[in-house]
Amino acid sequence: MGTRLLALAPWLLLLLLQLAGASHVVHRSLEAEQAPSSVPASIVSPLLRTGYHFQPPMNWINDPNGPLYYKGWYHLFYQYNPKGAVWGNIVWAHSVSQDLINWIALEPAIKPDIPSDQYGCWSGSATILPDGTPAILYTGIDRPNINYQVQNIAFPKNASDPLLREWVKPAYNPVATPEPGMNATQFRDPTTAWYADGHWRMLVGGLKGARRGLAYLYRSRDFKTWVRAKHPLHSALTGMWECPDFFPLQAPGLQAGLDTSVPSSKYVLKNSLDLTRYDYYTVGIYNKVTERYVPDNPAGDYHRLRYDYGNFYASKTFFDPVKHRRILLGWANESDSVTYDKAKGWAGIHAIPRKVWLDPSGKQLLQWPIEELEKLRGKSVSVSDKVVKPGEHFQVTGLGTYQADVEVSLEVSGLEKAEALDPAFGDDAERLCGAKGADVRGGVVFGLWVLASAGLEEKTAVFFRVFKPAGHGAKPVVLMCTDPTKSSLSPDLYKPTFAGFVDTDISSGKISLRSLIDRSVVESFGAGGKTCILSRVYPSMAIGDKAHLYVFNNGEADIKISHLKAWEMKKPLMNGA
């Protein structure tokens, strides 16, 4: 199936020699708990542990923190529990890579060891200072039981070390504390700072009252003393804003990224909404005089775009100076039970790193897996000009598909068969997908069944459903869904349908889909990255070489596979696992 390790590059061999006997001191001493008899054998099978998505060998991870590039290495820090597969005992674990795909774990970089973080080291960001030195801003918990939150700073102990293995915390920590009237238990996750007019600026997520989420704005002349501005950069009645992110964009359609301190006419403000556990963003204007952010869409704060319409949270972007791109990282939690996670001995993965840029329309971001992922592609098959009749499905054979990358261009010849969109659903894509799942026949509905068993008892559907235009001159409405309701026969799984509308004109009948299939995760990109959906699934039958791939048509019009190419994916170096 092609899951062997890639031949080690010279830089990997060198690093392994440097770190011999040092890596995974924490990990290797821990073992998964004995699986209770109530846990299905398939759940603890190593064949459900992802093959090419980021994760440590064992235990719990959540938010990606402080990604940066330094002296030839990409660094990723992440929230990690060194003692088990549930949240708790959080430290900043640390991994390095030279391609964002092959990773080697170092010792944790930041642990609770000063008064202002003695009860927890929570999320934060990295900033590269003018002399090239990185600095980390992060949230510390400094009181027991109540999660009282302050902001701290850390610097490399030895800036000449390209691996940044040791970090020190100045005695002047904390650098920002909640003031009277602020909710000290909802004050966290400082952003990458940006520099202009002699001042550094950063944002910290917060909550005012019961409902107003906000991005507190802080300024500093020396990156040491931080003062809160009189007003936040932006706020809205949405609930607590976690993990804010703020960055400039190139002109619409330009794929290059910008360093966070480079001024621009367009910006993205993103927050992770604590109430829904989804990541939302708006595109807008940053007024540098008033120091306020204004979304282009006045209703954008309440009808916001999402990076991903599936299981994707606590994301962080960074500017990659090597390839001049902005890269998005995000966390995908498990959709099984805590009992299952303890039995497995691990929980949580990160999405494949994505390049992000502004769509030519200027209204939304486009996202695409970084090009380095293609190095993992192995054996492939291609299908062209294959017609799938209504009610039929076509199996893609000739390769293993439980760890695969699939790109397909599809064409529907009968858009007049599309159903009318029931206005009762409004703009609620998720509810619409729940009512019009993959097995609901009629109209125009087509896509992929992935991680499917031979008899289709198990299958995860990634598909499009097209609806008639809402009015004269309007374009057809395209819904993209991931439907895992039949993904597994195992009990006690959370199997929600995920969905988002795709802002594309399908009047020509053409649309594309890419799905990254990786054992227990399906990460999909519709219409060139306009709509993205990540879903966690746990097949009990469609595992390993018993997993199959199909193109299906449950509509009333012919579907043509204009071109499909699928690759088996090799296993990269993944933190020693």
Swiss-Prot record:
GO terms under biological process: carbohydrate metabolic process
Residues forming the catalytic site: D63
Chemical reaction(s) catalysed: Hydrolysis of terminal non-reducing beta-D-fructofuranoside residues in beta-D-fructofuranosides
Enzyme Commission number(s): 3.2.1.26
Annotated SUPFAM superfamilies: Arabinanase/levansucrase/invertase, Concanavalin A-like lectins/glucanases
Main location: secreted
Localization: Secreted, Extracellular space, Apoplast; Secreted, Cell wall
Keywords: Apoplast, Cell wall, Glycoprotein, Glycosidase, Hydrolase, Secreted, Signal
One CC-aspect GO term: apoplast
Extent of the signal sequence: 1-22
Keyword Hydrolase listed: yes
InterPro entries on file: ConA-like_dom_sf, Fructan_Metab_Enzymes, Glyco_hydro_32, Glyco_hydro_32_AS, Glyco_hydro_32_C, Glyco_hydro_32_N, Glyco_hydro_beta-prop_sf
Entry annotated with the keyword Glycoprotein: yes
Superkingdom of source: Eukaryota
Top-rank EC class of the record's enzyme: hydrolase
Glycosylation sites: N158, N183, N333
GO molecular-function terms, A-Z: beta-fructofuranosidase activity
Protein family membership: Belongs to the glycosyl hydrolase 32 family.
PANTHER family, A to Z: BETA-FRUCTOFURANOSIDASE, INSOLUBLE ISOENZYME CWINV1-RELATED
Function: May play a role in sucrose partitioning during seed development and in stress response.
Protein name as it appears in the record: Beta-fructofuranosidase, insoluble isoenzyme 1
